[in-house]
Amino acid sequence: MERIFNPRQFGALGDGITLDTKAIQAAIDEAGIAAERGAKTIVVLSKGIYLTSSLFLKSHMEFRMEEGAILLGTTDESQYPIMHTRVAGVEMEWTVGILNVNGQEDVKITGKGCIDGQGPYWWNKYWGEDRKGGMRKVYEAKGLR
């Protein structure tokens, strides 16, 4: 049996202004529960701009982004959790990305939508506006290149 979960049914607005992380994650979590019970689950992001931070996909699900759906990563750094990880061979605490599939299996990310992580913001944060400062100095001190 196939079950569709639309984050709008969980309160997502898709207006590009409201932070929709909790609503999208709620849809993902419900899909995960249904998948554990044997259902084929699909989380469908319909047309809209969904401002979000980190999302954690579950096993045995499809995350489908329809044409015109944009998953827009927030630049509010306080919204991203920090996890212990390894970056360039160095153990450290690091912020989590937008879409995460940790310890899960049989996960599909499909569709014609777009994931926009707002790269220029993070690029400038790393290099600094003057291309000499920024977070690069912090990373280099930890042995990252």
Regions found by a protein language model. Give the residues of each.
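Extracellular/periplasmic carbohydrate-active domains that bind, remodel
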Residues: 1-145
